[in-house]
Amino acid sequence: MRLKIAKESLLNVLSHVVGAVERRHTLNILSNVKIQTNAQALTITGSDLEVELVASTALSEGACLEAGETTVPARKLMEICKSLPTAALIDLQITEDQRCILKSGNSRFVLGTLPAEDYPLLTTENSQGTQVQVTQRELKRLFEKTAFAMAVQDVRFYLTG
């Protein structure tokens, strides 16, 4: 797997899913995010076995030099992306010995990976979503009627509203 992507694009997608990744993990792979690439898009998945977040971004023509999938440490990847200059172009490559090499300018980082096949997925590929249409006024009214029940401080971030 190999792709070239702007720092801001990768950071934007990564920041959407890193919240679901466990800091203290029971399984090593749960501290990773799953990265999938093809000619059209980059998809990143993060999970803690209760919540799964998936975010995608379109890739420009020629950005994906080799399609593939792997998992990399989420927080380390996030910190590396944050430390790079704003207009940086990141060359992300998975080697044959399953190492993730990130290059940008004079910087070079090597991260360990785990097989993408071992990553736990909560959704199924053929699941069909349900769509509901609600007016803005009705949705606001529903939020106002239930807001009092939201937890203010809870380790399970999805319960805090």
Q: What are these regions, as identified by a protein language model?
A:
Residues 1-161:
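Structural preference for solvent-exposed beta-strand-turn elements
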